[in-house]
UniProtKB/Swiss-Prot annotation:
Record-stated family: Belongs to the protein-tyrosine phosphatase family.
Gene that produces this protein: STY-16
EC number annotated for this UniProt entry: 3.1.3.48
Protein name according to UniProt: Tyrosine-protein phosphatase 16
Protein's organism: Styela plicata
PANTHER family according to UniProt: PROTEIN-TYROSINE-PHOSPHATASE, RECEPTOR-TYPE TYROSINE-PROTEIN PHOSPHATASE
Amino acid sequence: WRMVTEHTSTVIVMLTGLVEKGKKKCEKYWPDLGRRATYGQIALKTVDETHVGSYIKRMLEITSNGKMQFIHHFQFTSWPDYGVPVATSDLFRFHKAVTRIKTQKPIVV
């Protein structure tokens, strides 16, 4: 989270699920909807979560050193456990949703 706040990133893209074949694949690094979490001096809250077909879009509120900013968090949920998606249409829709957010800041993937 320090990297996100230092570079004032406004978009995070996640291309994996949390679990694959029953094994943890990725740590959940954001709190549940409406909840707050603290990571050192950084406070984080999930203020919105929308399931859109093959992805989830979240709005995160992050506060560090008295400064608050919002982060668009996109999680692609249709990547198969092994291999690549059979069709590319879901991935194209996901990409389009991400690129609709206009930013000059780094996108965290």
